[in-house]
Amino acid sequence: DKKLFNDGFVDKPMDQYWAGPFKVSNWNSSEKVITLAPNDKWWGEKKPLLEKIIWRQMGIDSLRAAFKNGELDAAGFTDAATYSAVKGQNGTEIRSGQNTGVQNLQFNATRVTDLAVRRAAFAAVDRSQLADVTFKQVGWEEPMPGSMLAMPFQKGYEDNVPKDSGADAAKKILEEAGYTKSGDFYQKDGKTAGFSITTFGSDTVTQAKFQRIEQQLKQAGIKVTNDNQPESNFNSVVGTKSYDCTLSGWAVGANMADSPQYFYTKDINNGVGDDEIDKLIAKISATESKDEQIKLANQVEKLHMEKVAIYLPFANGPSYSAVKSKLANYGPRLFQTSYTDANLWVNVGWQ
């Protein structure tokens, strides 16, 4: 049923398709609130401890304020500003773990069309400085990630980011592509080497990261401007790819060989890519050996970062849950999901 597949869950709970311990009892898309209740058709041996779960979608500034005001029992976040704001609040605690995601600088290659500019930016960015800005307020340390596909602790992980880096390496890329220096910045055919970075909201850490990038790229002769948008514009701007470049974040899956198709095909990047890379990605799904799949995935990522240059990882980071202290069995959990363990939500309850 094509219509059911495409539209069946649009503003409809569709309880007959929920097989887990909870089902939808109220769905309010206009207020971005969904309420779950125990599923009377749940087949598991253990019954849920909670009588209901209310989920609310909100921006990070609103989430921070709502938790401080006692409107939320739990709030997940990764940013330093929220950590500082909610830390030490009476009757609450912060539970921390490894975030299974990657923060990255992400180009829209249909707008920043010159590969030389994208490659030069990759070389010019000092990723360690971005990680320092991101984590210094929370005391988090980690190895520098070199992949969009895997966490550094996962089997098969490799650092696939090009090794030639720094302002001189970036300048060499531009000059070999025919750019010449004019004042502070490089130019070619009357056009300045540069682009805008779209940021959202007023988060001080995000703005500090932009300033570091701006300084680093200026040293390499690349001009960067800040296209600062209201936080409420995030979905529309990112969804329509109305940006040159942005600071983004993606989840990392448990099997890295599943992920190249979501980052590195021409189709996923609006036609920008490489035929050789697409053939290698197709080969992954036709390969039986898991080890060979992982080798191919790393080969794909290395080639894409060198030949296409759209995604530049710079941090994995922590995962935090600010919770009321009496809430049990809830918090960061690495790759555990309700899809892999139905008891994940069954065991959440109040002490």
For the regions a protein language model found, what residue spans apply to each?
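Gly/Pro-rich hinge or "lid" segments in bacterial periplasmic/extracellular proteins
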Residues: 1-45
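Ligand/substrate-recognition segments at binding pockets and active sites
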Residues: 29-31, 180-252
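A ligand-binding cleft/hinge motif common to bilobed small-molecule-binding domains
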Residues: 78-89, 252-257
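Detector for C-terminal structural segments
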Residues: 125-156, 205-214, 238-351
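Periplasmic-binding protein-like
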Residues: 95-107, 270-278
